[in-house]
């Protein structure tokens, strides 16, 4: 019955579109990338860009499927696999009547006369993000989105397997080449869609033109599994540049001043400078990113505006040290330290002789952030130039 209802619903949607003068070829769908990877430095707002698009186009939650790749991701966690499933079974007597708890059973009164239910374990096919999105796309004319976070942290060849062939789309937005579905997937899809559905015709899989796959990739991540060129060619790529953050209205559009300029967010680091003012987050980012670029000759390790979160436009001292400085020390300075640079020294307790800054120096004996040392480091950053390097 469910297969029939979904088929009827799809036909009704198609008829409505035709009455409106909208055909699949006219749809905005092909203007939206079918497969696109948003990439850039951490904190540039890659995931937010996707969310903005989905919100702006009123994509319903039932048409959005999410997953995150990691080193242990594989075909089973992305597509589906047989797994043990906990099920409930009623007990029946010889007459086919459910057996209930008796009054003299040593149970709370709430279960008195309730049917007895046994829990058993059975094996069944459990679909994951890809297959859930695939089924949904064949059940509706609406655009369906499969979102993959951190795609380069997993072994894409292992995760996609033979689905790799489906990523090659034709001019109509559908897979140029179909693949034979495994017996388990074929059985599952025939149960969900019906054996005559285009999504499993002749036991073959084919991506429809309303299924979009969008992914994010941090260029700073040290990928355990590099993405090969053949896989890359099947995606559109969108670079998200590091930029200042700007205010937006409820409609998602940028707010502008009287002169038509976008209004900056104006985040601050909740650490005082020598004049008693908080440090400007964007000014710090511009300077530290120029240092990182000098160290690494690359933008990959640089920080985006949304690398950490601000509360009431302030980045707390704890967040700044535990997230920003920890990242710099662990992922940048450790491998790309500047020899004899003034960036890593400070004068303690008014001493004339500078000493090296190590990460533990950012905390006092009680484990609280030492604001004065953090301020010294920020001052070093703001005053740094490549002439400091010998």
Residue ranges and their predicted role:
Residues 1-390:
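C-terminal regulatory/interaction module of P-loop NTP-utilizing enzymes
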């Amino acid at each position: 019955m469910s297969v029939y209802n979904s088929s009827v619903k799809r036909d009704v949607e198609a008829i409505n579109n035709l009455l409106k003068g909208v055909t699949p070829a006219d749809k905005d769908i092909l203007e939206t990338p079918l497969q696109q990877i948003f990439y850039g430095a951490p904190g540039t707002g890659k995931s937010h860009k996707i969310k903005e698009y989905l919100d702006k186009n009123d994509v319903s939650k039932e048409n959005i499927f999410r997953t995150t790749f990691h080193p242990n991701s594989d075909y089973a966690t992305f597509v589906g696999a047989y797994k043990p499933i906990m099920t409930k079974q009623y007990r029946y007597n010889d007459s086919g009547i459910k057996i209930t708890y008796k009054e003299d059973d040593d149970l709370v009164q709430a279960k008195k006369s309730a049917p007895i239910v046994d829990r058993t374990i059975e094996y069944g096919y459990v679909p994951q993000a890809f297959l859930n999105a695939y089924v949904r796309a064949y059940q509706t004319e609406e655009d369906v989105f499969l979102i993959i976070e951190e795609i380069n942290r997993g072994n894409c060849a292992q995760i996609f397997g033979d689905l790799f062939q489906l990523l090659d789309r034709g001019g109509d937005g559908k897979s140029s080449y179909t693949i034979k579905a495994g017996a388990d997937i074929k059985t599952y899809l025939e149960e969900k869609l019906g054996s005559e559905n285009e999504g499993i015709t002749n036991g073959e899989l084919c991506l429809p033109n309303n299924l979009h796959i969008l992914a994010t990739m941090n260029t700073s991540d040290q990928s355990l599994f590099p993405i090969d060129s053949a896989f890359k060619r099947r995606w559109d790529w969108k670079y998200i540049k590091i930029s200042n953050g700007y205010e937006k209205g409820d409609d998602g559009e940028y707010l502008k001043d009287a002169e038509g300029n976008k209004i900056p967010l104006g985040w601050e680091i909740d650490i005082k400078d020598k004049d008693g003012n908080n440090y400007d987050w964007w000014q710090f980012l511009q300077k530290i990113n120029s240092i990182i670029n000098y160290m690494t000759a690359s933008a990959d390790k640089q920080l985006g505006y949304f690398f950490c979160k601000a509360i009431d436009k302030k980045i707390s001292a704890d967040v700044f040290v535990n997230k920003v400085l920890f990242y710099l020390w662990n992922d940048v300075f450790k491998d790309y330290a500047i020899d004899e640079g003034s960036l890593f020294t400070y004068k303690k307790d008014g001493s004339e002789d500078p000493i090296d800054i190590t990460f533990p120096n950012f905390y006092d004996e009680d484990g609280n952030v030492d604001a004065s040392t953090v301020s010294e480091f920020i001052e070093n950053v703001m005053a740094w130039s490549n002439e400091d390097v010998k």
